[in-house]
Amino acid sequence: NGENIAECEFKHIHQDIIETVRENMPEEDILVDLAELFKVLGDQTRIKIIFILFKEEMCVCDIAELVGMTQSAISHQLRVLKQARLVKFRKEGKTVFYSLDDDHITKIFDYGLHHIEEMYKR
C-alpha cells in the first residue's frame, strides 16, 4: 500500500541462518513449478472457477452460467486448470462434472481467501 521497505542500516551476513535456509531450499525445478502454479492462479476467471468448485462440483454449463462466459471459454480455462492438476472431472452419462483435484487446492484457496478477507478488515 505504498509503504517504504525497511532495510538494514549496516551489512552483516548471518551465515548460520543462511546455511540453514540454503540446506532446506527446494530444488530449482520445484520452485519453477511453484511459480507456474501461482501464475495459473493469477487469473480472475480461473479464481472464480476455483471458488465455484470450492463450493460445489459442477458441470461446464453451470460454471459458464455463473461466470457469465461461453462454455468454450470456460472449457479453455478448465483445460488450463486441469493441466496444472487443480481440477479433475468425472462423467455421468453425457454430463461432465468438474471438482477441485484434491485437498491441497482447497486449502490453498481457503488460506488465500482468508488472507484477503483479513486485509479488508484492517
Which residue stretches match the model-derived regions?
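N-terminal leader segment of winged-helix/HTH proteins
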Residues: 1-41
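Generic structural signal for conserved hydrophobic packing positions in ordered secondary structure
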Residues: 42, 74-77, 112
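Short intrinsically disordered, low-complexity coil segments enriched in acidic
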Residues: 1-3, 47-48, 118
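Conserved segment of winged-helix/HTH DNA-binding domains
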Residues: 99-122
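N-terminal helix-turn-helix DNA-binding core of bacterial DNA-binding proteins
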Residues: 24-72, 96-103
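Beta-hairpin "wing" of winged helix-turn-helix
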Residues: 82-92, 99
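Alpha-helical residues within the helix-turn-helix
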Residues: 65, 76, 82-83
